[in-house]
Amino acid sequence: MSLEPFKHSEALTFGVELELQLVNRHDYDLAPFAPDLLRALKGAQHAGDIKPEISPSMIEISTGICHTYQQALDELTTMRDLMQAASRSLNIGISGGGTHPFQQWADRIISDSPRYQYISELYGYLAKQFTVFGQHVHIGCPSADESLFLLHAIGRYVPHFVALAASSPYVQGVDTGFASARLNSVAAFPMSGRAPFLLTWDAFTAYFEKMRNTGVIESMKDFYWDIRPKPEFGTIEVRVMDTPLTVERACDIAAYIQMLARYLLLSRPFMPQEDDYLVYTFNRFQACRFGLEGEYVHPNELTRRPIAEHILSICDALVPHAEALGSMQALANIRALAENRNGDAEWLRQVDADARTQRETVRQACERWAA
């Protein structure tokens, strides 16, 4: 299909999507409970959406179009509480986190939908290994061209988003040494990575048509980029975050992205350029591997500092934007997280060290999500 026209949306509105783990309460392994949970939730009144995902051991919740941090927090909290109430009668545990600590990918089932079955046929075992859990944030853009400016400008801050949300240190029972191992699964897909450096919608449309004519892609859904335009919504979609362990942290990160977007669109502190991507992969790796302790190389100044320090360095510039958006609490939470460097990956490792069993780690992660 041809590329859709870029739909009008209200600038700086946002939406949040969270992919969640469903586990049984016996051994806390992933379990295919999404159909049962969705049946139990049928008719429940809430904003946003609750829907199945690529595996029936996963479920996605998403807000509606939000203007404020508090609105997103209220919507996600309501859906969380509804799901917790329904899950108790079904003996289901629900958890955040970018990976399940000890699930075996070969045990996974692919959901019975045409798109997911197509992905399974095309990518083979990679589809089952894609049972990982991410947070996506959509940001409304004033125009198609502005969406591409914002996509590339905010790309400098991808290491911030990865490090702040990192919650996937374990894969198949092994401590990977990474703060966010989830993104290694995404990197296996051929259309992953970063979007091409194009700053006009006409140029992007021409690129899309060339790619479509090769037969490699059919729609924007076939691009697994870290940040991609979503013309049907009039947004860009930031896709690099693990699902945090709490609704509150997910909303803090979404609000941080919103205030960064406002800063970049209104203040124009720099113009994106191709050379911004010289250190993109290095910075992204540092965030995945070391989280907030990772190194950030500035693409123009060529200076090096911890990612946590780079986050703190931008926080002062974001104050007027956080005030305008009603997100001062979120900014304070982000600042505290960067100062203390006590992210979700660190929490999981500490619980695992104390509990000495990953089943107990998952149980406590379920309790943390429900709190």
From Swiss-Prot:
Q: Which Pfam families match?
A: GCS2
Q: What class of enzyme is it?
A: ligase
Gene3D superfamilies, A to Z? 3.30.590.20
One of the entry's Gene Ontology molecular-function terms is: ATP binding
Give the reactions, separated by semicolons, that this protein catalyses: L-cysteine + L-glutamate + ATP = gamma-L-glutamyl-L-cysteine + ADP + phosphate + H(+)
The alphabetized UniProt keywords are: ATP-binding, Ligase, Nucleotide-binding
**Enzyme Commission no:** 6.3.2.2
Q: Which domain of life is it from?
A: Bacteria
Q: Which GO terms describe its biological process?
A: modified amino acid biosynthetic process
SUPFAM superfamilies from the xrefs? Glutamine synthetase/guanido kinase
InterPro entries listed in its UniProt record: GCL_type2/YbdK_subfam (IPR050141), GCS2 (IPR006336), Gln_synth/guanido_kin_cat_dom (IPR014746), YbdK (IPR011793)
Reported function: ATP-dependent carboxylate-amine ligase which exhibits weak glutamate--cysteine ligase activity.
Instruction: Tell me which HAMAP family the record gives.
Output: Glu_cys_ligase_2
List the PANTHER family hit by this protein, alphabetically: GLUTAMATE--CYSTEINE LIGASE 2-RELATED (PTHR36510:SF1)
Family of this protein: Belongs to the glutamate--cysteine ligase type 2 family. YbdK subfamily.
- Name-wise, this protein is Putative glutamate--cysteine ligase 2
Q: Which organism is it from?
A: Cupriavidus pinatubonensis (strain JMP 134 / LMG 1197) (Cupriavidus necator (strain JMP 134))
